[in-house]
Amino acid sequence: MKVRTLTAIIALLIFLPILLMGGTTLMLFAYLLALIALKELLNMNMIKLISVPGIFSALALIIIMLPQSAGDWVSNIQLKSLIAMSFILLSYTVLSKNRFSFMDAAFCLMSVAYVGIGFMYFYATRSDGLHYILYAFLVVWLTDTGAYIFGRLMGKHKLWPVISPNKTIEGFIGGLICSLIVPIVMLFFVDFNLNIWLLLLVTIILSIFGQLGDLVESGFKRHFGVKDSGRILPGHGGILDRFDSFMFVLPLLNILLIQM
């Protein structure tokens, strides 16, 4: 418990100033986190980052995360890079004499999309306003807190025991309820250009998909037989263990709130 608490304090001391600064500093930080998350995901499938598929996956990730504000050429190069990566990885299945399989190639492509889109929206959301990223983090944190408290106090019905045995339906509902505190409080300080009822609806959707994102990563770990995605955060696991909910929440936040 002491290790977990100390890790959280150190992480916050590093993370919060970078989040407040935003800009290029945050973008580079997002790239670093994304590369670590990609490494964690590939490691689950016994694919090393320093390997032919690992290196091409990392290059594709970097391109996928290019800021859309840089111009129309970004979308064009992103599409071409994914097409090129598909051909390269499929060709490598032949060159490796099927030691690197078709399923491995598909896994690399999925990993790049999953991690790249999530972390691209991490810095993109901050660029749209500090209040948006704070809103996202608070929704996820209060959802997690509510799910834990309600699950411990009232949890009797398993939510999805095959994937995550400790999660309960009561915890799921408790997370939704606690997440609603965020918009109610933030509206006193921030104008989201949205009425309270729509913002509450958006919050419920984000809370649901945040918990779904958590279950998706739990599914990855259970499928590959690992407890944590990594060890970089003592007491907490890996980067994916901390950011799994945000992989779903941040893109949805942009679609439902920022781009409306």
From Swiss-Prot:
Protein's membrane topology: Multi-pass membrane protein
Classification via Pfam families: CTP_transf_1 (PF01148)
Entry superkingdom: Bacteria
Enzyme class, UniProt record, top EC level: transferase
A molecular function (GO) term: phosphatidate cytidylyltransferase activity
Pathway: Phospholipid metabolism; CDP-diacylglycerol biosynthesis; CDP-diacylglycerol from sn-glycerol 3-phosphate: step 3/3
Reactions that this protein is recorded to catalyse: a 1,2-diacyl-sn-glycero-3-phosphate + CTP + H(+) = a CDP-1,2-diacyl-sn-glycerol + diphosphate
Keyword entries, A-Z: Cell membrane, Lipid biosynthesis, Lipid metabolism, Membrane, Nucleotidyltransferase, Phospholipid biosynthesis, Phospholipid metabolism, Transferase, Transmembrane, Transmembrane helix
GO biological process: one example: CDP-diacylglycerol biosynthetic process
Location(s), subcellular: Cell membrane
Membrane-crossing residue ranges in chain numbering: 9-29, 46-66, 70-90, 102-122, 130-150, 172-192, 196-216
GO cellular component: plasma membrane
Keyword Nuclease: no
Record EC number: 2.7.7.41
Family: Belongs to the CDS family.
Protein name: Phosphatidate cytidylyltransferase
Organism (species): Staphylococcus haemolyticus (strain JCSC1435)
